[in-house]
Amino acid sequence: MRKFLSLVFIAVLLSSCSTVKNQQLTNYQLPATNDVVMYQVNPRVFAPNNSLKAVEQRVEAIHDLGANVMWVMPIYPIGKVKSKNSPYSISDYKKVNPEFGTIADMKSLVKTCHANGMSVILDWVANHTAWDNVWMKNHKDWYTQDAEGNVIFPPGTDWTDVADLNYDNPEMRAAMIDAMKFWVTEVGVDGFRCDVADQVPADFWKDAISQLRKAAGGRKILMLAEGANPDNFTVGGFDMNYAWGFMGALDKVFVKGNKASDLIDCDKREYGEIPKGKIKLRFTTNHDEATKYSTVQQFGSVDGALAAFVATTFLHGGMLVYGSQEVAYPEKINFFNYVPVDWNSNPEVLATYKKLIAIYKENPAISKGYLETYPDDNVLAFEKTDYVNDFLILVNVRNSKQSFKNIPSQWQNSNLTDMMTGRNIRLGKDVELAPFQYMILKK
């Protein structure tokens, strides 16, 4: 009888532990896709070592900025063979780079983010691995080979530090999905940002995403494709993909002097290519863009960077903030190395980003309302409405004074609220805007 009771006690204890673990992984819900405010974490701007702990110490600050999803760049061990020290050259998909910490540190970061109302998605590199990945020794057939049987780096790239994976091999596909499941079921992450997703077969993503949603055990997961192929949605099952086209248009308008209305045309084109309800991730920078220049450098000034941010996110979300832009970090960032960022610098810029993100989040008419546009060469002008609240947004895309002479009649001679200052204003038929000035007006 004692032995029987002991076995019963152990069974109950194990069941209780399993229930607790399941509750820890299921007691937090993702924001709706069209409510996502994503913050990209490059661990190498937080600390030279033990970076995950350093990121965890800033979770409250990131949440206070307005983020509800944290995207963490690759945290896995980096290969040593042919290495460029890129975090996208992975030697083991189920371990953490000692430079950043441990799996326990990652679990703690996820738990702290959830406690602060943020989801966590991990960067996932499915297209290629490091040359000394644990798979290479025993599974050479999992890699793409040339006619002589030599493993090759990804065709059409200069990524010589990584080996191209062979998606004709079903065993490799299964191993890849198993590794992704590990981070969902054992660590509790809420999804993935999938690197160069367009280079991986869409039918793989369909299978992987289906299995991940089942493995999540009732939790929703967020899947973001770094790519612009509509197949990401129609075949693969992703929730979001990249607005690379809009980023290119933004540079042409703000930097090269193209018409402001080109942004409207690009927006219509991008959203016209994807299924209704899916979201393009809009950004003024990310880890790739930041290797070339900071937003301050690219858009000519802090004011230019903020104007570009308003044009990008208020026209049509989703929203991405790359960790460092909120404090107007002035230089480019090479994510292959540690780059210290002073998080206490430029508090007035941080306050402005907070205000803009709060306006975006607190007003569904802006984040997901109906869009009416008013094309102009030098001012991006558009209206957002949910038929209860109406907003007129004007963005001077030039580093010079500009007059917008086509104020819609319904916005003329009305009492309007400037959402940034709280002041009441009235508009006539035209308005003059200072260099890179933007106005967010509520009727």
Please name every model-derived segment:
Residues 67, 189, 238, 317-318:
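A structural motif
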Residues 185, 195-283, 302, 311, ...:
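Active-site-proximal helices and loops of the catalytic beta/alpha 8
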Residues 85-94, 141, 156-163, 243-250, ...:
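Short glycine/proline- and charge-enriched loop/turn segments
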Residues 37-39, 70-72, 120-122, 192, ...:
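Hydrophobic faces of well-ordered beta-strands that scaffold small-molecule active sites
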Residues 20-53, 57-69, 74-187, 207-217, ...:
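Substrate-binding/active-site clefts of carbohydrate-active enzymes
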Residues 4-14:
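Sec-dependent N-terminal signal peptides
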Residues 71-83, 123-132, 195-201, 225-230, ...:
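Short, solvent-exposed turn/loop segments enriched in Gly/Ser/Thr/Pro and often Arg
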Residues 16-43, 47-71, 77, 302, ...:
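Carbohydrate-interacting/catalytic domains
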